[in-house]
Amino acid sequence: MAYRQLTLEQAAALLRCPERFLREQAIQGGLPHVRQGDNLLFSQEELLNWSSIHLLDNRKCRKKEQILSEGDQRQERILPGNYCSLEGISPQLKGKSKASILMSLTELAEKTGLLYDSSDFYESLRLREEQASTALPGGVALVHPHSRDEFLFEDSFICMAKSQYPIFFGEENGRTSDLFFVVACKDELHLPVLGCLGRLIAETTLLGDLRLAESAEEMLMTLHKAEQNPSCLLTD
């Protein structure tokens, strides 16, 4: 599938960040781009993949975000719970390895009825983890596809799961993970949802409360309760 090429101005608008920052990242920070004379062009898909890694890396290091930081002064409440269904929540996810957890998460995602091909979805999750782990401090991973190809899933959705056994999922300090979100969102929602979940993880008791939840219903109620915190109110 061909993805559109974005100018520097369009790329900065998509990520809600300064053009200067993106130019610096392209020249010095490894952001994929092509140069046409004095102009920089970006593949929309490569840009979103890079920004996902950048956003999660900043969560790991607790740095001030450089994306999703500036915009048009709108206020928009992004609620991940709106994209969750009970079918996509598991309080007892099976798996004792990263590969088996990814397979179980794919099976959970398939229960939403929104996947076109579960094997393609699994492969996209695997490729994203191969690129860089989505595991964060606190025992949680924000798993998402390497691509948001329109043929991967019909509509945006989020899955939540709590594994029966904490496993090493790639967290940089070697700690295990037992809570997993699968973020399968279209381009316009992908980064805002990742950003909101990151804020909920950092600024609320979401993770601890999810560990106490015993059913899918309780896990969904826990997420909705956490969303009452202003963390998901973007004032860009």
Which residue ranges define each predicted feature?
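Cytosolic covalent-transfer regions centered on His/Cys nucleophiles
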Residues: M1-D236
